[in-house]
Amino acid sequence: TDAGRRTKSTPTLLLLKRSSDTKHTRNGHDSVRQWSDNFANRLVLSLERMLPNYNVVRFSDRNSTMMACHACQMRAFHSAKVVIGMHGAGLSNILYMNPGSAVVEFAPYANDARCLPGGGPFSRLAAVISHHYMMHHPPTEEYKWTAGRTSEFNDTRFATHIRNFLASIDFL
């Protein structure tokens, strides 16, 4: 949920959501990088099921209050233990996360050098700040296109991949 279920002992996982029709979204024409609100809600639910010890918070470009408050964005990223986002969807804000946090970059295109570990800006930034980094790239045949210029993919497989990554770095 946008508000999440915040407690001091529950680590926060931020799920960055891009929309095709907000003033904050660049590349609004790139439907593979946009998720509908309905699909984003399904992703949150899948992540909550797989990661019950995390406070899963949707960080959306539709939240105009958050988008207008840079200090609020910095605080949100600083308090997150895990950030998951589409390539370019505000991932530069991982700069404000604590060292040793986890970053998952969703890479929608095969063989895109911007997303290759060590070759893309976010994997390099994660390395410099000592974040754990993982890239998720769903198979092309897994994508579904919606009428609203958005994409969907297998949310259960995605959440399982995230859980396995977090288990591998002792974040569960």
Per-segment meaning from a language model:
Residues T1-L172:
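The feature primarily captures lumenal catalytic ectodomains
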